Swiss-Prot record:
The keyword Secreted applies. InterPro entries: Antimicrobial_frog_1 (IPR012520). Keywords: Amphibian defense peptide, Antibiotic, Antimicrobial, Cytolysis, Disulfide bond, Fungicide, Hemolysis, Secreted. This is Brevinin-1SPa. Belongs to the frog skin active peptide (FSAP) family. Brevinin subfamily. GO terms for biological process: defense response to bacterium; defense response to fungus; killing of cells of another organism. Coiled coil: none annotated. It is found in: Secreted. The keyword Heme does not apply. GO terms for cellular component: extracellular region. It holds the Pfam family Antimicrobial_1. Antimicrobial peptide with activity against Gram-negative and Gram-positive bacteria (MIC=13 uM against E.coli, MIC=3 uM against S.aureus) and fungi (MIC=6 uM against C.albicans). Shows hemolytic activity on human erythrocytes (HC(50)=7 uM). Disulfide bonds join 18-24.
Length: 24
């Protein structure tokens, strides 16, 4: 269960950071 959440966060957080800061 936890690895799935961690995997999703690993993909989600960078994309959110990219959208917010406009740095990809």
């Amino acid at each position: 269960f936890f690895p799935i959440i961690a995997g999703m966060a690993a993909k989600l957080i960078p994309s959110l950071f990219c959208k917010i800061t406009k740095k990809c």
